[in-house]
Amino acid sequence: MTSALLNRLNLYPHAAHALLGLIAVAHVLTLWFALNASWLEWMIAVACWFITGSLGMAIGFHRLLSHGLQTSDRCRRFLIWCGCHAMTGPPISWVAIHREHHRYSDTPLDPHGPEHKGKAWVQLFSMYHKPSIKYAKDMIRDPYLTQWQKHYFSYHMALIVTGIVLTMATGSMVWLALHAVPAVLTWHTGSLVNSFGHSEHGAKDSHFISMLSWGEGYHQLHHQNPKAHVFLGKNAPFDVSGLVIKGFINKDAR
């Protein structure tokens, strides 16, 4: 793959600035939603949060793309589609940053290590990092992923603008519940895993963070065995994404 194509796939720092700009607008829209939404609209937002946070990020981007969970091609594409609506960055960049995190975990080179960058910085800017494509070379051969990588920001910009226009035109908050609100919830609950899922000794497990992040809070277990896709049992009772994997995606996953 040529360096020119890699540059188009990466687009840093413009991509990083665009990501922060999009999520900043989504925060404003979420505040608007919180002040005006009905209980039904909140329920829709939570359902979409499950789609983006569990199906998309915890399973799709994390356990499948980053760590090799096996499933059918149709299911794989659906999970990636869900993850691409979470507004945490395009898939190839996200995978590269996450694998770099594993490579340099809890060192000054960790892209989002709270001991070196600070918990507040990690919570707010955990994905503001230049991805090194060498950590995702297997991703750039997939045309489905490269198309998402190229059009990710224009796609989300269109969704944001459409959501604002439809909300103002109809007076219904449901349009924000479908995109902006679950994106913000996914951003912050996912960031909790890195900002507060660490101690001075390294990654740590948290039932509370796991409940908020669909099972991603078992951070120490994950770092001990990154290729494990399911964390269940008495040490990890709140791995909702693991239950989804075992029940609907790959019953043989471990």
Question: What function would you assign to each model-found segment?
Answer:
Residues M1-S191, Y218, A228-R254:
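Non-catalytic, topology-defining segments of multipass membrane proteins
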Residues N194-D239:
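Glycine/small-residue-rich hydrophobic helix-like segments
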